[in-house]
């Protein structure tokens, strides 16, 4: 784990936020920067507790740490029982809740993620010479049903019905880490937690959303995040590579292909604002795959969340969201 002390505003891959503070600390977990901006009595103790929490969470939920819960599940044989920690069961239950509403949010898509070389161990961002063929994708999809993962919340046991089934909480873990860190800092006067671009704050802040296809401006819009709310953004510009001049990104739909990859009007990014960073994280992935429709509006309403969806030359918005656009494409 790496820790850095800074007094400057930091620009990140997907989101930039500005907040005045005396100091901030950056830790590296989940293969990303985790920024802790808090001030108040006993703030140093709170930061120490947050660092310990992030370390434990990463070691529990990572797909790349050998002895994590997720790695143990992924390496297990069919019907081999694995006993896991409370956060794993909590996220399995929450993921199932969202999956049952719309199966596009599927933590069991990880065999497809690996097939396309988007796992932490294989992704490089360098243009590739080939992509998976349809037959290979079809075989991998056979192991990608979330129904292959079975767990018992009463004793924290998990097993798989398919040896090749694997899970990945990449679409929800940063939000969980953000909410948990925020809770540990709840007695502080000023709080902004930023876990790889998933942000939660106890006071109103302005967040700059990166322009997915920057030409004139680095940022596409500014969103006002109310107090005790969070924001998460998913986009096709975060992890991608090119093949035959076509961009392939890391967010997969149920066909086993990157969402919108062959569309003439693809979604480029989705930002969700709401009270739960975990839910914002999950819904930004879900809406990136599905776009804004009646069903997505219902789930946003159920979770008291708002959405901003950016296309190449227009946008869609749902809910009470204060947005100022900075890029001419969206004015």
Language-model segment annotations:
Residues 2-8, 12-331:
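Mature catalytic core of soluble alpha/beta enzymes
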């Amino acid at each position: 784990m790496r820790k850095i002390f800074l007094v400057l505003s930091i620009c990140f891959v997907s989101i930039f936020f500005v907040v005045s503070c005396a100091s901030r600390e950056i830790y590296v977990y989940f293969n990303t920067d985790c920024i802790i901006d808090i001030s108040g009595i006993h703030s140093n103790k709170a930061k120490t507790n947050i660092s310990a929490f992030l370390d434990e969470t990463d070691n529990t939920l990572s797909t790349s740490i050998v002895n994590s819960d997720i790695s143990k599940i992924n390496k297990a044989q069919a019907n081999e029982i694995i006993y896991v920690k409370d956060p794993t069961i909590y996220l399995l239950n929450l993921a199932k809740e969202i999956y049952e509403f719309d199966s596009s949010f599927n933590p069991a898509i990880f065999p497809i993620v690996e097939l396309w070389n988007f796992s932490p161990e294989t992704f490089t961002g360098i243009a590739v010479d080939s992509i998976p063929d349809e037959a290979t994708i079809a075989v991998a999809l056979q192991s990608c049903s979330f129904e292959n993962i079975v767990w018992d919340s009463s004793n924290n046991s998990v097993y798989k019905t398919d040896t090749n089934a694997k899970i990945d909480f990449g679409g929800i873990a940063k939000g969980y880490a953000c909410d948990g860190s925020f809770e540990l800092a709840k007695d502080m006067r000023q709080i902004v937690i930023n876990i790889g671009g998933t942000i939660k704050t106890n006071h109103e802040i302005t967040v700059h959303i990166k322009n997915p296809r920057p030409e004139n401006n680095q940022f596409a819009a500014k969103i006002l995040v109310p107090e005790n709310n969070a924001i998460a953004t998913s986009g096709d510009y975060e992890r991608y590579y090119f093949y035959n001049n076509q961009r392939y990104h890391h967010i997969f739909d149920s066909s086993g292909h990157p969402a919108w990859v062959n569309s003439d009007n693809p979604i480029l990014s989705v930002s969700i604002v709401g009270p739960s960073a975990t839910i914002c994280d999950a819904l930004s992935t879900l809406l990136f795959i599905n776009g804004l429709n009646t069903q997505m509006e219902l789930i946003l309403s159920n979770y008291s969340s708002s959405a901003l969806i950016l296309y190449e030359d227009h946008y869609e918005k749902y809910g009470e969201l204060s947005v100022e656009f900075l890029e001419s494409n969206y004015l």
